[in-house]
């Protein structure tokens, strides 16, 4: 009985240790904060391309390091970019599906920061041009990188 009580106590204590929160309560921030100073430097962000790209823009007080608040704002900005790019990609694909003469299943569409990239192989140069024109006409598209090839 005594052994069972000790074993149960150890399990409960270890579960409590596992339940400890990270220093800021944000696992993403804390995982990047290698030196555990409560800030993120540009070097600490180097492994996260999207966050590193946003470093200068979201360094609120321009001290060369991010607070948790800076990190959260940059993350929200990146999440909004992803949502906007996904919406554009969906709209372009939908336009291709509804347009006669466009082999939609032969065209890959990717969007990054409003730039749409078209890849794949279609039957003719006319289809290449038409697909590019359709993509360019979609709301939110800033640029079309048309890499479609004609057979």
Regions found by a protein language model. Name each.
Residues 2-12, 16-151:
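N-terminal targeting leaders
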